[in-house]
From Swiss-Prot:
GO terms for biological process: tRNA pseudouridine synthesis. This is tRNA pseudouridine synthase A. It is an enzyme of class 5 (isomerase). Substrate binds at Y111. The keyword Isomerase applies. Homodimer. It comes from Listeria welshimeri serovar 6b (strain ATCC 35897 / DSM 20650 / CCUG 15529 / CIP 8149 / NCTC 11857 / SLCC 5334 / V8). It holds the Pfam family PseudoU_synth_1. It catalyses: uridine(38/39/40) in tRNA = pseudouridine(38/39/40) in tRNA. The lineage of its organism: Bacteria, Bacillati, Bacillota, Bacilli, Bacillales. Formation of pseudouridine at positions 38, 39 and 40 in the anticodon stem and loop of transfer RNAs. Keywords: Isomerase, tRNA processing. The active site is at D53 (nucleophile). NCBIfam families: hisT_truA. Belongs to the tRNA pseudouridine synthase TruA family.
Amino acid sequence: MTRYKAIISYDGSGFYGYQIQPNARTVQAEIEKALKKMHKGKNVRITASGRTDTGVHAKGQVIHFDSDLDITADKFQKALQVMTPFDISFLTVDEAPADFHARFGTVGKEYRYIVKRTKIFDPFSRNFALHYPYELDIAKMKLASECLIGEHDFTSFCSARTERDSKVRTLYSIDFYEEDEETLVIAFQGNGFLYNMVRILTGTLLDAGQGRISSEDITEALLARDRQKLISKTAPPQGLYLWRVDYE
């Protein structure tokens, strides 16, 4: 039995998230369906670095699975590329150590959120970015982001449905890239992220850019450890991308 590590990308628009759900199209279900065909009806379970929600995309999701097929990793990659749907891509497949674990072995992740600042709505980007036709002060957004960097209890910045006992996470950086006059990319790097955390942080920073909230408001929300203390809305899923997963 050989363990394989794969880096995959997917367009989340047509999926009800990553994780298998009854009577729903998911990324995990489509990949396991392909692996089952390759293994002549035998179920092969895959494990990912983490789940993504409905409509959320991935540029560098990492999964692992075990197989007893006598084929090379390169052939695995080519076969899975053909056998999975057009909205999933296998970027790499490599043999991995037997103790490699896509979820528990992570030391950091990067998420990016894409904001389109066009005055007129672009229907061709509706599934891949947030349309935000309002003025933004990027300097205020950067200032607001500074109080979020470091180790904090992010209870105020995650969904009440978060299942984790500890809400303490470390944000290494929040960077802002203006790719052009119309496109703003917000990149979040940290040791881990809670349910809806990046989308709530994005909504908060957009409010800061509009002057609706200040750095002091964000600091107070952090200390309150109560989602109800934060007035910012959760940014919609279509602008969010799991960009990269890091391992030791």
